[in-house]
Amino acid sequence: MKISELRDKSLEELTQLLDEKQLDAFRIRMAKATGQLGNTHEVRVNRRAIAQLQTLINEKQRGDS
């Protein structure tokens, strides 16, 4: 999802997306550890998405837009 699309979402939606991404990150790490992960690029993409969501959540909590 693009950052501009994420900025339009509410704080509750962002926290829900963050929870989903963190669960995905856990699944990806487990797949990598067991050797079942074919595309290792997913680790980086997922970690970046989590960072973007955390940044947007912090901005909304502080009142910045």
Curated annotation (Swiss-Prot):
Pfam families: Ribosomal_L29
Entry GO terms, CC: ribonucleoprotein complex; ribosome
InterPro entries: Ribosomal_uL29 (IPR001854), Ribosomal_uL29_sf (IPR036049)
Keywords: Ribonucleoprotein, Ribosomal protein
GO biological process: translation
Family membership: Belongs to the universal ribosomal protein uL29 family.
Record's protein name: Large ribosomal subunit protein uL29
Source species of the chain: Psychrobacter arcticus (strain DSM 17307 / VKM B-2377 / 273-4)
